[in-house]
C-alpha cells in the first residue's frame, strides 16, 4: 500500500477526481486558487462561484454524495493491495512529462514500481495483428533498449504492445523495466489474454491508469 497523504487530503483528491460535472481543467483552476484540494471544500459557494458555474459551486460546497463516499472507500480498500499506489498531480512522483500535456490527469492509479514513473521512457506501439517479423523486431528492440536503461512504455494490447513489454522484461532486474499504460480501470486487464503478462509487469515493472 502507498498512501502518503493525510486522510482528509486523500478524500479531497478522490472527490475532486469524481465530482460530477467538474472537468479536470476546472479542477486545476480550483487547485491553483485553493492550494490543497481540502481547501476547495472549505470555501463558501459564493467564492467557488467565481471559479466555476454557480450550480457546480453549490455542489462543491455541500457534503459529498454517497456515490463519492462509496468510491473513496473502495479505493482505500484497493490501496491495501501489494504495491498499490495513488499518485496525485501534486505528488513528486507524478511523471514530469505528463505535466506538459494539455490535460494531465488529477490522479494516477499505479501497481508496481512507482519509481519507474521518473525513469527515462521510450514508447513502443504498433499493430495488434502484427507479423511474426514485426513481433520479433519489437521484442529485440525493447530488450536492447531496456538493457541500456530505458523504461519501455506501451499499452498492453495484443501484438506489438505485448512484444515490447515482453522484450523489456527479458532484460531482467538490471534493465530499465516496462510501463503499461492502461485505457481501462487499473483493476481491469484488457485484453484478458494478457492477464499473465499484466501480473508479470505488476511484479517487475509498473501498471498505470487514470481510472
Per-segment meaning from a language model:
Residues 1-93:
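Short, small/acidic-rich helices and loops at N termini and domain boundaries
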Residues 2-9, 88-211:
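Glycine-biased, small-residue-rich flexible motifs in mid-sequence functional cores and linkers
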Amino acid at each position: 500500500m502507498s498512501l502518503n497523504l493525510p486522510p482528509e487530503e486523500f478524500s479531497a483528491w478522490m472527490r475532486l477526481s469524481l465530482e460530477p460535472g467538474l472537468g479536470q481543467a476546472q479542477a486545476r483552476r480550483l487547485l491553483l486558487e485553493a492550494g490543497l484540494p481540502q481547501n476547495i471544500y472549505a470555501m463558501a459557494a459564493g467564492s467557488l462561484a467565481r471559479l466555476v458555474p454557480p450550480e457546480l459551486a453549490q455542489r462543491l460546497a455541500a457534503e459529498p454524495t454517497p456515490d463519492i463516499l462509496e468510491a473513496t472507500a473502495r479505493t482505500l480498500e484497493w490501496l491495501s493491495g501489494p504495491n498499490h499506489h495513488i499518485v496525485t498531480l501534486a505528488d513528486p512522483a507524478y511523471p514530469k512529462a505528463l505535466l506538459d500535456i494539455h490535460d494531465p490527469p488529477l490522479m494516477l492509479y499505479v501497481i508496481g514500481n512507482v519509481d519507474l514513473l521518473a525513469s527515462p521512457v521510450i514508447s513502443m506501439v504498433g499493430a495488434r495483428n502484427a507479423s511474426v517479423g514485426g513481433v520479433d523486431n519489437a521484442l529485440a528492440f525493447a530488450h536492447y533498449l531496456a538493457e541500456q536503461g530505458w523504461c519501455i512504455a506501451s499499452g498492453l494490447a495484443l501484438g506489438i504492445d505485448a512484444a515490447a513489454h515482453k522484450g523489456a522484461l527479458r532484460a531482467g532486474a538490471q534493465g530499465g523495466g516496462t510501463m503499461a499504460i492502461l485505457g481501462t480501470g487499473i483493476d481491469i486487464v484488457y485484453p484478458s489474454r494478457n492477464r499473465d503478462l499484466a501480473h508479470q509487469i505488476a511484479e517487475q515493472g509498473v501498471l498505470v491508469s487514470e481510472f
